[in-house]
């Protein structure tokens, strides 16, 4: 009787331990999903911001070109604004990549990755 009782107690403890581990993993996954959603939202805002930066840099570049034609801006000014526009475009591309990574991570965590052939 005592051997069986001990085995039952041991199995009960193992079952409880497994339940706790499952609960911990579930909470950990839920936390990762929340973090991934927040990361995706942050990167989405960054894409929006960098889009606005490109528009601004484009406007400044066009104004500088016009000023150069009128003789009020130098070639150096044009090159500087051209460089600023290119930097804004590069920053935008990096932001898009970061967004896609965050979106993929969220899909991975939630099991929403579809493989279309």
Give, region by region, the residue ranges found by the protein language model.
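Sec/SRP-type N-terminal targeting helices
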Residues: 1-59, 94
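Short, flexible micro-motifs
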Residues: 4, 74, 114
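Acidic, low-complexity, intrinsically disordered peripheral segments
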Residues: 29, 91-117
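Canonical tetratricopeptide repeat
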Residues: 36-37, 75, 96, 103
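Charged, solvent-exposed structural "stalk/scaffold" segments
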Residues: 42-94, 107-109
